[in-house]
């Protein structure tokens, strides 16, 4: 599953123009102990990637705006590229009581 996501991201990155004006940035979000995301709100630019890393002892998930639910085991990560400006909400569907946040893409 992670390989497929990575392959899709790499394929999409290769489909654009060969000219690049700025490098793509990656922002990391920790799935910290106490069932929370750190930071909860992220501001990025279109084309940037967010990587969620599970630093907790429990399995968590990342679901952005009701799309595919990505299972993230202890010590693993999942990365999602955000190409379209807007506000996106993400949640751990296993522990949604306080494990939610926002990605703002400018």
Spans of model-derived segments:
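Extracytoplasmic copper-binding redox domains, predominantly the cupredoxin/blue-copper superfamily
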Residues: 8-11, 15-106
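Sec-dependent signal peptide recognition
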Residues: 1-6
């Amino acid at each position: 599953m992670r390989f497929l996501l990575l392959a899709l991201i790499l394929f999409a990155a290769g489909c654009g123009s060969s000219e690049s004006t700025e490098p793509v940035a990656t922002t990391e979000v920790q799935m910290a102990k106490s069932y929370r995301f750190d930071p909860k709100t992220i501001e990025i630019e279109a084309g940037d990637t967010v990587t969620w890393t599970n630093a907790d002892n429990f399995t968590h998930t990342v679901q952005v705006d009701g799309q595919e639910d990505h299972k993230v085991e202890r010590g693993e990560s999942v990365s999602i590229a955000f190409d379209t400006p807007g506000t996106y909400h993400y949640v751990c569907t296993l522990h949604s009581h306080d494990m939610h946040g926002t990605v703002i893409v400018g």
